[in-house]
Amino acid sequence: MQRIKLIIAYDGTNFCGWQLQPKLRTVQGDLEKAITRITGTTVRVHGSGRTDSGVHALGQVAHFDVDSCFASVKWQRALNSLLPDDVTILDAQLVSPEFHSRYSAIRKTYTYTLWLENSFFLPWRRHYVWKCGPLDFCALDQGMQYFLGEHDFSSFQNTGTEIKSTVRTIHEFKRYPGQTEQEMILEVCGSGFLKQMVRNMVGCLVRIGRGKAEPETVRSLLQMKDRTAAPATAPAQGLCMAGVYYGETGCGGTADTGRNQAQNCGINRED
């Protein structure tokens, strides 16, 4: 058997998330159908993480196992010839059998795009930004700093997934200009993320940026470990899985895989 690693970009607008669901269109489902057409057998695809309905990806990583008789297949070209226009393979490579797209990951990066203008809105950006209006950048920056480090993120986890621990480490949280003058991108890098954790953090930060909560609210919520006390979840459409880091482990992964491959393909990370 051979293990193939994929780096995938997709527009999540018309998908019911990543994970396979009966009678619903998902990214995993489309990938498995395409691979099955090539191999003639059912193949299970394993992703680095589950994105929700409407969430996009520039650096989702997945792997699957196939018989060695398919060693000559050019997987990137073959899959892209079968996949619909809203999902594409940025890279495909043979990796060690020890590599696992989820369990080998050291850290992940997500971006969230905000629309800061109230007076007008570009309709074609509606599936990729949250129209939140003007924000106090100073308060926003202060709020982001409280997320850094190792914390119990129970207050920022939505229910629905069984996990062993709610403790995660945030390595970096920053902001920078987006695709247009009216957009701003929040980028967060962490050891891993709980269910809808990034969207919950963004929802809290926007509330702070609007002046409806103090930056110190983040610290208080982390200490409370109570999801019901935290602000509402940010909409799905602004979120993008930007990349997954596997380190120089010999398992077939390097830093920010999605970002690197997207740049090689001429795709800007802020798209």
UniProtKB/Swiss-Prot annotation:
Subunit structure: Homodimer.
Name by which UniProt lists this protein: tRNA pseudouridine synthase A
Gene field: truA
Xref: SUPFAM superfamilies: Pseudouridine synthase
Reported function: Formation of pseudouridine at positions 38, 39 and 40 in the anticodon stem and loop of transfer RNAs.
Gene Ontology biological process terms from the UniProt entry: tRNA pseudouridine synthesis
Alphabetized InterPro entries for the sequence: PsdUridine_synth_cat_dom_sf, PsdUridine_synth_TruA, PsdUridine_synth_TruA_a/b_dom, PsdUridine_synth_TruA_C, TruA/RsuA/RluB/E/F_N
Pfam families: PseudoU_synth_1
HAMAP family in the record: TruA
Keyword Isomerase on entry: yes
Keyword Isomerase appears in the UniProt entry: yes
Alphabetical keyword list: Isomerase, tRNA processing
Active-site annotation: 52
Sequence similarity: Belongs to the tRNA pseudouridine synthase TruA family.
EC class (word): isomerase
Example of a GO MF term: tRNA pseudouridine(38-40) synthase activity
Source organism superkingdom: Bacteria
EC assignment: 5.4.99.12
Binding site for substrate: 110
